Swiss-Prot record:
UniProt GO MF annotations: S-methyl-5-thioribose-1-phosphate isomerase activity
Family: Belongs to the EIF-2B alpha/beta/delta subunits family. MtnA subfamily.
Name of the gene this protein is made from: mtnA
Effect of inactivating the gene: Mutant cannot release methanethiol upon 5'-methylthioadenosine (MTA) feeding. Deletion mutant accumulates both S-methyl-5'-thioadenosine and 5'-deoxyadenosine extracellularly.
Entry keyword set: Amino-acid biosynthesis, Isomerase, Methionine biosynthesis
Organism of this sequence: Rhodospirillum rubrum (strain ATCC 11170 / ATH 1.1.1 / DSM 467 / LMG 4362 / NCIMB 8255 / S1)
UniProt-listed Enzyme Commission number(s): 5.3.1.23
UniProt-recorded name of the protein: Methylthioribose-1-phosphate isomerase
UniProt xrefs under Gene3D superfamilies: translation initiation factor eif-2b, domain 1, Translation initiation factor eif-2b, domain 2
Positions contributing to substrate binding: 53-55, 90, 207, 258-259
Pathway(s): Amino-acid biosynthesis; L-methionine biosynthesis via salvage pathway; L-methionine from S-methyl-5-thio-alpha-D-ribose 1-phosphate: step 1/6
Active-site residues, record numbering mapped to chain: 248
Role: Catalyzes the interconversion of methylthioribose-1-phosphate (MTR-1-P) into methylthioribulose-1-phosphate (MTRu-1-P). Also catalyzes the interconversion of 5-deoxyribose 1-phosphate and 5-deoxyribulose 1-phosphate. Part of a bifunctional DHAP-shunt salvage pathway for SAM by-products.
Gene Ontology biological process terms in this record: L-methionine salvage from methylthioadenosine
Length: 390
């Protein structure tokens, strides 16, 4: 995407090699600051401290972290150490594990003296793939928005705009470029469709108010920042035509783990018959997990993120301000799980599907579990279970 007219990705290699540059997202929207990451430790810190965030971008950054680790120590022990260091940074986003496993697999058979160069090339390929996947998500999501426009009569001069609510930041700042949930919105805006975006502030880190609003404003997309608890009211009064969010991990059965508060938006959308879509690339699907509520680890972050807010004062200084009484404890769950039954559809790079095992298997047949022979003991047990459920 463009930053002040300059095409910009969220992560890019230094011209002379041996380092990568990132956008320090903790400084937005008040300052646009880039930071150079020179080694594995710097990459791990950037992920842990959320200088970079969003599942796809975390994965891409981790890939470069492995590459920088190979420049430091290309031995088998060095590869293991780099992967373990990065895996420990944040537990919920599955793209982190996916990218690290992809790097480790591609480097395992490479001689140590060639690993640094091979790792650098592989990390770049992962970033390029992310951009292509996200643009494809945008194309498929655009089709849904066009259908909404026809239903609402917007294309024929009917009452507009198309009001879309989003939660947290699943734009280009959460990926290498384009974004997931926001990619269809950018495509729709650029196609001339009259859209308006309701932007949840997304406490406690205010990633909607700080990051999504900054993105949309930079691109010229009409939007309004709202308090997190406003969405249900807007839906009750017919002011939301569609909800679209991203995801940090999606199960093989269509459950979605996303920023805390997503589940409440899905409940409100379900109660008011508002379509609720989730946008995601294939690497965000965790094919090893079936029950999101029971199996996905939920990151708990520092309570200070809840008890303090960061912003610009009237004097122009950027400061942290405490908003809770001294001594009041705070809980800071970073994510929640939205059950598949509340989701209208999943928008992927391969198309749109139902949030279900069958829906995902239809788009990713190579990842679908092998069928159990009907005559086997497992098959008979499964059949008995299915019959009992009836």
């Amino acid at each position: 995407m463009n930053v002040k007219g300059t095409p910009t990705r969220t992560i890019w290699p230094a011209r002379e090699g041996g380092a990568v540059w990132i956008i320090d997202q903790t400084r937005l929207p008040h300052e646009f600051v880039t930071q150079r990451l020179n080694d594995l430790g710097a990459v791990a810190h950037a992920i842990r401290a959320m200088l970079v965030r969003g599942a796809p971008l975390i994965g891409a950054t981790a890939a470069y972290g492995v590459a920088l680790g190979m420049a430091e120590d290309p031995s088998d022990e060095g590869l293991t150490r780099a992967c373990q260091t990065l895996l420990a940074t944040r537990p919920t986003a599955v793209n982190l594990r996916w990218a690290i496993e992809a790097m480790a697999e591609s480097l395992a058979a490479v001689p140590p003296d060639q690993r640094a160069q091979a790792a650098w090339a592989k990390a770049g390929a992962i970033c390029d793939e992310d951009v292509a996947l996200n643009e494809a998500i945008g194309d498929h999501g655009l089709g849904i928005i066009k259908d909404l426009a026809r239903t609402k009569g917007v294309e024929k001069g009917g009452e507009g705009p198309i009001n879309i609510l989003t939660h947290c930041n699943a734009g280009w700042l959460a990926t290498v470029d384009w974004g997931t949930a926001l990619a269809p919105l950018y495509k729709a805006h650029d196609a001339g469709l009259p859209i308006h975006v309701w932007v949840d502030e997304t406490r406690p880190r205010n990633q909607g108010a700080s990051l999504t609003a900054w993105e949309l404003n930079s691109h010229g997309v009409p939007h309004t920042v709202i308090a997190d608890n406003t969405g249900g009211h807007l839906m009750q009064h017919g002011l939301v035509d569609m909800v679209i969010v991203g995801t940090d991990r999606t199960t093989a059965t269509g459950d979605v783990c996303n920023k805390i508060g997503t589940y409440l938006k899905a409940l409100a959308a379900f109660d008011n018959a508002v379509p609720f879509y989730v946008a995601l690339p294939g690497p965000t699907i965790d094919w090893t997990v079936n029950d999101g509520l029971r199996e996905i680890p939920i990151e708990q972050r520092d309570a200070a993120e809840v008890t303090r807010v960061w912003g610009r004062t009237a004097a122009g200084a950027l400061e942290w301000v405490t908003i809770t009484p001294t001594g009041s404890p705070a809980a800071n769950y970073a994510f929640d799980v939205t059950p598949a039954r509340l989701i209208t559809g999943l928008i992927t790079e391969r198309g749109v599907c139902a949030a279900s095992a069958a829906g995902l298997a239809g788009l990713y047949p190579e990842r679908a579990p092998a069928p159990v022979p009907a005559g086997s003991a497992a098959g008979k047990g499964a059949a008995a279970t299915a019959d009992g459920a009836l």
